[in-house]
Every structure is written in C-alpha cells, then in structure tokens.
C-alpha cells in the first residue's frame, strides 16, 4: 500500500512522462555506480597482482551484466498480453523467431530460433554440424541481426572461408589452378557483400568459459545480439574444477543464462559419444557426451546423423529434433553438399506424422 501511495503521489505531481524520465535517470545512476564499483574492484585486483587477463575478463563481464536490459519482474497481465500477441503473430504467419534458412526445420521449431533459448546441435565428427552452424549464422546475418561465432577449433579466417563458400557456392581451392572461369568474380562479389554483414568471430586461443563470457560481453556492449554460436561445447573448460561432469554442468547452465541475460538465441554445438558408431543405431539424447546437464539446460536438442541408405552423389542427413520445449519433436531430412558446406531441405520428409521416429 505504501508503494502504491508513492506511485500515485509521483503520478499526480510529475505526470506519467516525467516519471518515465525519472526512472531512466535512476537506471543511469545505477549503471554509473556499477561501473564505479567494477573499476574499484579492478584496481584492488591489480594491487593484489592478479593476472591482467583475468582482471579484464571479470571487469567486462560485470559491466555487461549490469547493463542488461532484461527486467527482473514482469506482471502476469503484461506477460499474458505479450504471449497472446505472439500467438496471433504465429497464427498470422509471422514470427519474431530467427529463421534457420531451412523452412521445414523452422516449422518444427515454431518459426526458428527464439530469444532467451539455448539450442544444442549434436553429431559425430564429419557429419556437418559446424557447416550447418555456419549456414545458420549466414541466414541470421542476412536478416540484419548481429551474430557472434565463437569457434574453439577454427581461426576467424577458416570460419570466414566456410562462410564464403556457403554463400557463393564456390568450393575452397585444393590445388593450383583449381578455380574455374567466373569463380574469382563470384568470390570477389561475395567478399564485397560480406563487408557489411553483422558477424564477428572469436579469434584467440582461449578456451575457458570465462574467456568466452568476456568475448560475448564485449560484443553485447556494442549492441544487441540475435544469435550466438559456440563451436563446440566440450572444448570449453573451467579451470579449478575437479569433475568433468560438474564442469559441463556449469558450462551448459552458463550458456542458458547468457541466452536469457543477453535476450538472444544461443546455438551450442556438441559431440555425441564415440560408442554410437559401433552400435548401428540412430543417436538419442543419452548419446550426448556428459549428457545429463546439457539435456536438462537446453530448450531444444537437434541430433544429426547420416541416412543409412546413402546416395553416392550426395550426403543425406537426418536432423532429429529430439527435445523441443516449445514445439514438436520430430525429424527432417536435409541434403548436405559437402564441397560448399551447403544444406537444403529434402522431399519427402521422414516420418513427419510420427511423434518421434527415433
């Protein structure tokens, strides 16, 4: 009652517009105080001779978290109106979700990737999970949304090379004179177009969770992000932790928190257990390496594998949406053109009317 009286008093005295300006000033003051505290802490850490990299990462993470625009409390009435608006948007054929560029996969995901959600894309090596993630990065950037690609096994130029082949349709040369007439012009035109794409790559050797957080925090300070890709989850480490299971649990939980705090989609690539190759069966959620926490924290898990009856002229890939917190659980068939790293939807779809064919 006391708070309500204060709000009514302010409304009568200053008017609605003035209250909004007053709240904005309070937020700015809070952020300023947070920066001051972070600076004092960094100064104390320097006096204690802590490593400069650790101090820098902690400082950036603190600032980025404090400047998060997510609200701590949302009234049920406001949330229900937002939910209803989203229902109507989807019903009308529109969506705020980020398209994967694969219409049939989008249909299963409810339009594509959603803000605040953690997606896990898992496969054995060589199936094409990095290629698919690169393509999804390209599709996101085409829509003008900022994307950060954090590869822990490829350099920025290697990632960009895959992106260039995917977008241009020209495979990477493997020998002298490999490029055909017209290929250079295609590549040059594509490179020119890529100058304005809102994509950044992580290009350093750090593979710690804290290092990833610092990289993403810097990106967030430069503006809102649409999609974050982490390639891949098992390569991340947390110094000082004894148990790998606990380490993976912290990593997956942190990635989910990043999606929520930065209000964006996070796509984390993951390995499947090696034993799967000798068991002659399709992958399941339990095949995720250190699977318990990954499966629990993810909003959606996509499992990729090659179709058993393989056409020698192309790779047929089954992408099974094995967990989907906000949609259907079923599979879609993709064609993978390996030389250019390009995926496309196939006809017909595999077992579309079954709840889960695997």
Where would I find each of the regions flagged by the language model?
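Short, well-ordered beta-strand core segments
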Residues: 147, 266, 301-303
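Conserved H-loop
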Residues: 152-154, 264, 269-271
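Amphipathic alpha-helical transducer elements in NTP-driven molecular machines
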Residues: 16-19, 32, 99-102, 106, ...
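The Walker A/P-loop phosphate-binding site
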Residues: 71-170, 189, 357-358
């Amino acid at each position: 009652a006391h708070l309500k009286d204060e709000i009514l008093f302010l409304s009568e005295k200053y008017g609605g517009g003035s209250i909004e300006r007053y709240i904005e000033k309070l937020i700015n003051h809070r952020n300023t105080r947070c920066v001051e505290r972070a600076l004092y802490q960094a100064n104390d850490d320097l006096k204690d001779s802590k490593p400069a990299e650790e101090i820098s990462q902690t400082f950036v993470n603190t600032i980025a978290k404090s400047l998060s625009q997510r609200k701590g409390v949302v009234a049920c009435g406001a949330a229900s109106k937002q939910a209803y608006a989203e229902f109507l948007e989807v019903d009308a054929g529109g969506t705020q979700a980020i398209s994967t560029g694969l219409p049939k996969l989008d249909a299963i995901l409810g339009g594509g990737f959603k803000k605040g959600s953690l997606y896990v894309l898992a496969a054995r090596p060589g199936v094409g999970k990095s290629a698919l993630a690169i393509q999804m990065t390209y599709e996101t950037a085409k829509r003008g949304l900022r994307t950060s690609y954090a590869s822990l096994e490829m350099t920025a130029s290697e990632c960009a090379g895959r992106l260039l082949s995917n977008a241009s349709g020209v495979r990477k040369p493997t020998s002298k004179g490999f490029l055909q007439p017209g290929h250079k012009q295609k590549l040059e035109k594509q490179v020119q177009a890529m100058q304005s794409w809102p994509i950044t790559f992580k290009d350093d050797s750090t593979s710690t969770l804290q290092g990833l957080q610092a990289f993403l925090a810097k990106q967030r300070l430069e503006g809102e992000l649409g999609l974050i890709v982490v390639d891949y989850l098992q390569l991340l480490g947390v110094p000082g932790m004894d148990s790998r299971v606990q380490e993976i649990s912290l990593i997956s939980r942190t990635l989910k928190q990043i999606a929520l705090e930065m209000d964006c989609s996070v796509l984390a690539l993951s390995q499947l257990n090696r034993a799967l190759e000798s068991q002659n069966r399709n992958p399941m959620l339990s095949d995720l390496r250190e699977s318990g926490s990954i499966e629990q924290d993810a909003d959606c898990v996509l499992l990729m594998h090659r179709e058993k009856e393989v056409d020698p002229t192309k790779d047929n890939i089954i992408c099974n949406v094995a967990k989907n917190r906000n949609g259907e659980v079923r599979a879609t068939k993709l064609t993978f053109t390996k030389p250019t790293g390009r995926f496309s939807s196939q006809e017909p779809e595999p077992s579309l009317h079954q709840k889960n064919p695997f």
